């Protein structure tokens, strides 16, 4: 596939810790329910998964935030649970309760029965969306592909949906570690194939979302989450279309383990808001770029407070290469789009070199 040349490579340059004219910015969940035009598209699609599975609609909602704001990257509109769904677990959504699976994975027989999905055929709708979005971007900004981490996917597969304490999976980790490893290895193989297919179809950077890795002890994190993200990083296509394909790891509540994460060979770490970005830069900034890390709840505050927090984070990071501004987690549905605009424009204005 041949695509238009990239006009704005600020995001990719920052990921490689090269100098940029200002700090690039994008937001996790930037195509989402806070935008009225997204809500209209979702209603038109009929359901969230119908929206994900229609390449034209997925493309439309991916581009919506770029029409409103001066963002430096687009991120594929999809869901982290596409892989377990393709494994036959029956993903569905209950209003107000989030994602659920019709089948759970808790026994040796359950794990043995899990197929490794073929990204091109079993997840072809995602690849159609990637190539459609990349074509429609026409070189405006880079396209980010993504996946959930093996550990995070496993939490949903074993618990059957969202969980506060992950008791079934944690019991497996401590009572039957070999069973947990067998499942996580299958997931790591699946994620590697899935992200490589996204890269072949046009993703110019990829992010691994380890939303629940921070729920683990330090030892368990290294053994059951980081180990499998390392396996994925080792197996990814790192050059495509004559350019490096950067990899971002994001473990929510992973601030204690940045050095171990940076040692995986990834290009950048996503940070949540619980860590000072200046401290993070002093710890690992010579190895990786850093992405983050404003508390999404600041977007409910006044415009003046939003600008002040942007300035604080920029000042804390300092005049160094390798910063991509983002929120510390996804933007939430009740945020006023005008407040998101204040945030993004503050980053653009206050970070000009």
From Swiss-Prot:
It is found in: Cytoplasm. GO terms for biological process: protoporphyrinogen IX biosynthetic process from glutamate. It is an enzyme of class 4 (lyase). SUPFAM superfamilies: UROD/MetE-like (SSF51726). Gene3D superfamilies: 3.20.20.210. Pathway: Porphyrin-containing compound metabolism; protoporphyrin-IX biosynthesis; coproporphyrinogen-III from 5-aminolevulinate: step 4/4. The keyword Lyase applies. Keywords: Cytoplasm, Decarboxylase, Lyase, Porphyrin biosynthesis. One of its GO terms (cellular component) is cytosol. It catalyses: uroporphyrinogen III + 4 H(+) = coproporphyrinogen III + 4 CO2. The record marks 79 as: Transition state stabilizer. GO terms for molecular function: uroporphyrinogen decarboxylase activity. Substrate binds at residues 29-33, 79, 156, 211, 329. The keyword Cytoplasm applies. InterPro entries: UROD/MetE-like_sf, Uroporphyrinogen_deCO2ase_HemE, Uroporphyrinogen_deCOase. Its EC number is 4.1.1.37. Belongs to the uroporphyrinogen decarboxylase family. Homodimer. Catalyzes the decarboxylation of four acetate groups of uroporphyrinogen-III to yield coproporphyrinogen-III. PANTHER family: METHYLTETRAHYDROFOLATE:HOMOCYSTEINE METHYLTRANSFERASE RELATED, UROPORPHYRINOGEN DECARBOXYLASE. This is Uroporphyrinogen decarboxylase.
């Amino acid at each position: 596939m041949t695509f238009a040349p990239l006009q704005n490579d600020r995001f990719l340059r920052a990921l490689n810790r090269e100098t940029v004219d200002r700090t690039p910015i994008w937001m996790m969940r930037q195509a989402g329910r806070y935008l009225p035009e997204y809500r209209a598209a979702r209603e038109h699609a009929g359901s969230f998964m119908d929206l994900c599975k229609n390449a034209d609609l997925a493309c439309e909602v991916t581009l919506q935030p770029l029409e409103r704001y001066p963002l430096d990257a687009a991120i594929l509109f999809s869901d982290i649970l596409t892989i377990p769904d393709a494994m036959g677990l029956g993903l569905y959504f209950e209003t107000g309760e989030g994602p659920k699976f019709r089948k759970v994975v808790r026994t040796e027989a359950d794990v043995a029965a899990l197929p490794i999905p073929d990204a091109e055929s079993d997840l072809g709708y995602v690849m159609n969306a990637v190539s459609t979005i990349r074509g429609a971007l026409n070189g405006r900004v880079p396209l980010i592909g993504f996946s959930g981490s093996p550990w995070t996917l496993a939490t949903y597969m074993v618990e059957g949906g969202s969980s506060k304490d992950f008791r079934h999976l944690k019991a497996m980790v401590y009572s039957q570690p070999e069973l947990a490893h067998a499942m996580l290895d299958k997931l790591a193989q699946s994620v590697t194939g899935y992200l490589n297919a996204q890269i072949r179809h046009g993703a110019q950077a990829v992010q691994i979302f380890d939303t629940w890795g921070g729920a683990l002890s330090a030892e368990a994190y290294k053994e059951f989450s980081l180990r499998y993200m390392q396996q994925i990083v080792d197996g990814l296509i790192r050059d495509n279309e004559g350019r490096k394909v950067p990899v971002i790891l994001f473990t929510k509540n992973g601030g204690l383990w940045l050095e171990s994460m940076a040692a995986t060979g990834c290009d950048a770490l996503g940070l949540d808001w619980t860590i000072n970005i200046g401290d993070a830069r002093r710890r690992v900034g010579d190895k990786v770029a850093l992405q983050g890390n404003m508390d999404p709840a600041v977007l409910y505050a006044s415009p003046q407070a939003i600008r002040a927090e942007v300035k604080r984070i920029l000042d804390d990071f300092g005049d160094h290469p390798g910063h991509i501004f983002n929120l510390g987690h996804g933007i939430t549905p009740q945020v006023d789009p005008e407040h998101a605009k204040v945030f993004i424009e503050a980053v653009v204005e206050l970070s000009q070199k």
